[in-house]
Amino acid sequence: MPSALESRLIDLESRLTHQEAMVDDLSDVIAAQDRTIARLVVQIRHLAGALRDVELGSIGSPADDKPPPHY
């Protein structure tokens, strides 16, 4: 029969093993989230540029406005 000290040591080693596995899992999740965030930042920059182009294209000078055709 293991002594109290041996039982405690076995319990601590078991907890450490589980915590190490959890840290590895969380590290993988964080790395995946980092990749997702980087991809989303690129998409936002692209969309912001496209929106800016649309806004600049819709704001023309008054000379560019043609009068509507009359029937």
From Swiss-Prot:
- What InterPro entries does UniProt report for this protein, alphabetically? SlyX
One Pfam assignment? SlyX
Under the heading HAMAP family, the entry gives: SlyX
Q: Which family does it belong to?
A: Belongs to the SlyX family.
**Name of the protein:** Protein SlyX homolog
- Species, as recorded: Rhodospirillum rubrum (strain ATCC 11170 / ATH 1.1.1 / DSM 467 / LMG 4362 / NCIMB 8255 / S1)
Q: Source gene?
A: slyX
